[in-house]
Amino acid sequence: MAGQKIRIRLKAYDHEAIDASARKIVETVTRTGASVVGPVPLPTEKNVYCVIRSPHKYKDSREHFEMRTHKRLIDILDPTPKTVDALMRIDLPASVDVNIQ
């Protein structure tokens, strides 16, 4: 698999879970002998929702809720078959979305 690259994108609402998952992926890949670039922090996506507190009137009284989506990017250069097998077996939390390209 010389000259190839695996790109892993991680998404999560909890920054601690995504950092722990990225650390686990980097440790696994370096143990198998491939080189790693990252984890590169990508811009955090922030969604703000505005809700009226009262069920009927008092539109001036509002509440804001936000959801932050943290993202990380990891590139694996020159992966070996052992690296791919180790990545398939790695156990990550369910709260972390993994996209492998």
Curated annotation (Swiss-Prot):
It comes from the Bacteria. SUPFAM superfamilies: Ribosomal protein S10 (SSF54999). GO terms for biological process: translation. One of its GO terms (cellular component) is ribosome. One of its GO terms (molecular function) is tRNA binding. Pfam families: Ribosomal_S10 (PF00338). InterPro entries: Ribosomal_uS10 (IPR001848), Ribosomal_uS10_CS (IPR018268), Ribosomal_uS10_dom (IPR027486), Ribosomal_uS10_dom_sf (IPR036838). Keywords: Ribonucleoprotein, Ribosomal protein. PROSITE patterns: RIBOSOMAL_S10. Part of the 30S ribosomal subunit. PANTHER family: 30S RIBOSOMAL PROTEIN S10 FAMILY MEMBER (PTHR11700). HAMAP family: Ribosomal_uS10. Involved in the binding of tRNA to the ribosomes. Belongs to the universal ribosomal protein uS10 family. This is Small ribosomal subunit protein uS10. The lineage of its organism: Bacteria, Bacillati, Actinomycetota, Actinomycetes, Mycobacteriales. The gene is rpsJ.
